[in-house]
């Protein structure tokens, strides 16, 4: 099946396989029955294809076979992803001893000034055995581990053991269980020799790179070897807002660069083609091990392997069939890739380059030199193909993405190849390796500078509808736009060439093109007008005199208090990117006082967003090494850090804050929720009528709330930050004493905990406390009303 010169014969089977995987991974219990049914249909269609030899029947048969393979893979793999022994432990809340092998490097980047430490951020691993009581069961289950990081840097493939509790993930998730470690991890054994070799290379290269100044040194490990640990939240946000995030980590295109170098160098010295191909395959395997098997790298490696074996067999290859075959093979190996955004974006970007780069180059060449047109067409093709999916991750369209990519992309191969050579040279010839790393730093710095510059420009992105509506709307507009401007059509390109496409007519009717252009422009104009109007209206309605702001950062707390030109941030939420977005939206560049109520991930996970921006931090009692590492990071970034307890006080502008909990001696209270720092902000005499008073309860449970009340009274306040995201574990007396006008709840939409609970909401209602919650209302801004005790509430969204 060909259209306009494009070889589409395997594209539809790949799409069908993708849909089958995406559907069946969500209902794995039905996989055996559906697999049998699909294979029954496949057998019938194959028989008809042989008998009739009709093209559409052959395509249908291939689609059924591809779907059958993926369905069978789901049926075979699903039980191992969520074995009964782990499901039982999760349901019963039992403590288990878990043995896992790590899937990523753990430990701190010592050379980075403000890099994320190991702390409480989760990491991916594979559970290999579980001990429940005296029973030990071998398993092979992908998990996401919270806590349980060893003190020393630990490479990929190391085996760790620790006690934990489990929570089953949704069947379609990329992991089978969430693992919550109850103690520190013990290293049982190191990685296998191949992974240990790669870990050593990555560690030495990251150390050498991050010793270099600026963002270039932090970006280079990701560009060359896929190590993104040094990329801070500000640089990460800049790369994303300019459509350069694919350069944050190693690109799948690097596989093609590596193979091309091997083949060309081998040909130059007269190495036979067969030997060159075998050498290329071996180098390809080593490259994947070194940079880690990220989805884009694996996709590119499989495509490269297909091309190499086809070349060895003397068979011609074309881009789209190779891409489709690689996608089918990978989905058959791991059907859960069908729900992996990275894999989807990698396939879409490659498809966009194969289908659109040629026509776009020819179109742009009418107005600019051909070479410049080609440079612009490549990122434009990739962005057009990927953007409908990208809006699911970030509902906005980067307006400078194409220009930023055109400027940054030429530097990427230089940074990658030179950096990779430096990585390999460091162990044998450190002086040569360090020289190459320094040279690779130059193009990496250029890429970082491009991202930072364009991210700082006004209107760097256009807001877009969220979810499926946004995807469909953008896909329709993109398709109509392509129909309108690409009147010359497309032809499939040879993988061995540029991948350009061109040739026959795709849309020859001028009338159709004009209608497509008109509809696309009408949709864009209508949406842009509505969006711009809504945004202007929202900005005009937003109170400039806000004193308390609750950021919408998902399931967690991040609340700002503003007084007298000074800013306090109480907790940071779970995600640096979401916190950065909130701070930027409110124009907050500096934090005078950071309060970390306790060290759970939903309260400190976003701390990397403010490292280097905090003057003073106050924290509660540490629960272990990971908490101490966060404190050390804050100190290294220039903050003065104090552990506080009941009775400590301080000033923030025209507010005096008092610590009400924990006590200096914890007694039976363990670090964590029940040792949360509880803070009251009260106006000084000069601002008695113009400043909001507030009470922040952290995640304090009912028992600790009662102990706090027993330690001394609390004053009535205007605003209370509700404890523990609205859980049922609350003391009614605290809210009676607080007499708050507004209760703020930091909570994630559709969270798995049932927060906020009906009991808490009823409790607040009984006290006459109005509820402002971030899951339904987004950003919440509070400012003083006209009368004493009156609070004006502005929310980003109206509650349903």
Each language-model region and where it sits:
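Non-globular, low-confidence helical/coil segments that flank catalytic cores
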Residues: 5, 149-154, 158-163, 189, ...
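Hydrophobic alpha-helical transmembrane segments in multi-pass membrane proteins
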Residues: 232-401, 466-540, 621, 730-732, ...
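N-terminal leader/targeting segments
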Residues: 1-86, 205
């Amino acid at each position: 099946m060909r259209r306009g010169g494009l070889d589409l014969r395997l594209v539809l089977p790949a799409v069908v396989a993708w849909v089958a995987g995406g559907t069946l991974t969500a209902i794995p219990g039905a996989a055996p029955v559906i697999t049998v049914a699909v294979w029954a249909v496949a057998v019938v269609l194959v028989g008809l294809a042989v008998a009739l030899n009709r093209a559409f029947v052959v395509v249908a048969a291939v689609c059924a076979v591809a779907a059958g393979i993926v369905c069978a893979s789901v049926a075979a793999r699903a039980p191992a992803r969520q074995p009964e022994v782990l499901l039982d432990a999760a349901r019963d809340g039992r403590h288990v001893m878990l043995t896992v092998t790590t899937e990523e490097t753990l430990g701190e980047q010592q050379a980075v000034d403000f890099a994320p430490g190991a702390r409480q951020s989760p990491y991916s691993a594979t559970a290999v055995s579980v001990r429940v009581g005296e029973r030990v069961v071998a398993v092979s289950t992908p998990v996401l581990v919270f806590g349980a990081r060893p003190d020393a840097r630990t490479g990929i493939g190391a085996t760790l053991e620790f006690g934990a509790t489990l929570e089953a993930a949704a069947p379609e998730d990329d992991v089978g269980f969430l693992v919550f470690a109850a103690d520190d991890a013990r290293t049982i054994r190191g990685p296998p020799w191949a992974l240990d070799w790669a870990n050593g290379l990555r560690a030495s290269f990251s150390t050498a790179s991050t010793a270099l100044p600026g963002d270039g040194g932090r970006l280079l490990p990701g560009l060359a070897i896929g190590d993104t640990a040094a990329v801070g939240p500000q640089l990460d946000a800049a790369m994303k807002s300019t459509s350069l995030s694919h350069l944050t980590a190693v690109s799948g295109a690097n596989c093609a660069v590596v193979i091309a170098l091997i083949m060309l160098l081998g040909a130059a010295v007269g190495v036979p083609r067969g030997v060159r191909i075998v050498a290329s395959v071996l180098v390809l395997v080593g490259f994947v091990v070194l940079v880690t098997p990220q989805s884009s790298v694996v996709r590119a490696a499989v495509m490269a392997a297909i091309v190499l074996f086809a070349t060895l067999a003397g068979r011609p290859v074309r881009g789209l069939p190779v891409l489709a075959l690689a996608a089918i093979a990978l989905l058959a190996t791991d059907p859960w890739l069908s729900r992996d955004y990275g894999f989807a974006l990698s396939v879409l970007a490659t498809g966009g380059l194969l289908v659109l780069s040629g026509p776009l180059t020819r179109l742009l060449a009418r107005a600019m030199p051909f070479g410049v047109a080609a440079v612009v067409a490549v990122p434009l093709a990739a962005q057009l193909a990927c953007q409908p999916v990208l809006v699911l991750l970030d509902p906005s369209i980067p307006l400078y993405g194409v220009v930023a990519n055109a400027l940054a992309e030429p530097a990427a191969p230089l940074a990658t190849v030179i950096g990779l050579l430096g990585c390999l040279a460091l162990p044998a010839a450190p002086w040569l390796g360090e020289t190459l790393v320094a040279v690779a730093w130059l193009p990496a710095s250029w890429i970082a500078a491009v991202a930072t510059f364009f991210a700082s420009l006004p209107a760097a992105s256009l807001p877009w509808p969220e979810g499926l509506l946004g995807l469909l709307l953008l896909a329709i507009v993109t398709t109509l736009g392509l129909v309108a401007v690409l009147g010359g059509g497309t032809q499939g390109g040879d993988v061995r060439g540029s991948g350009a496409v061109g040739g026959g007519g795709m849309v020859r009717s001028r009338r159709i093109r004009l209608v497509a252009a008109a509809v696309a422009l009408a949709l864009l104009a209508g949406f842009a007008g509505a969006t711009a109007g809504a945004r202007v209206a929202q900005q005009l309605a937003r109170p400039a005199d806000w004193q308390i702001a609750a950021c919408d950062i998902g399931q967690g707390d991040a609340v700002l208090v503003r007084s007298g030109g000074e800013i306090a941030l109480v907790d940071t939420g779970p995600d640096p990117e979401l916190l950065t977005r909130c701070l930027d939206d409110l124009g907050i560049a500096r934090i005078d006082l950071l309060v970390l109520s306790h060290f759970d991930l939903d309260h400190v996970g976003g701390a990397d967003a403010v490292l280097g921006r905090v003057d003073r931090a106050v924290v509660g009692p540490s629960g272990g090494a990971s908490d101490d590492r966060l404190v050390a990071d804050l100190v290294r970034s220039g903050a003065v850090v104090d552990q506080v307890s009941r009775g400590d006080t301080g000033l923030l502008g025209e507010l005096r804050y008092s610590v009400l909990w924990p006590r200096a001696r914890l007694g039976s209270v363990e670090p964590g929720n029940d040792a949360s720092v509880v803070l009251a902000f009260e106006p000084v005499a000069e601002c008695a009528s113009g400043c909001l008073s507030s009470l922040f309860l952290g995640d304090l449970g009912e028992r600790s709330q009662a102990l706090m009340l027993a330690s001394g009274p609390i004053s009535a306040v205007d605003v209370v930050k509700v404890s523990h995201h609205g859980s049922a574990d609350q003391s009614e007396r605290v809210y009676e004493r607080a007499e708050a006008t507004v209760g703020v709840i930091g909570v994630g939409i559709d969270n798995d905990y049932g927060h906020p609970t009906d009991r808490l909401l009823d409790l607040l209602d009984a006290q006459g406390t109005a509820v402002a919650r971030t899951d339904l209302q987004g950003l919440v801004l509070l400012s003083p009303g006209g009368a004493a005790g009156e609070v004006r509430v502005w929310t980003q969204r109206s509650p349903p």
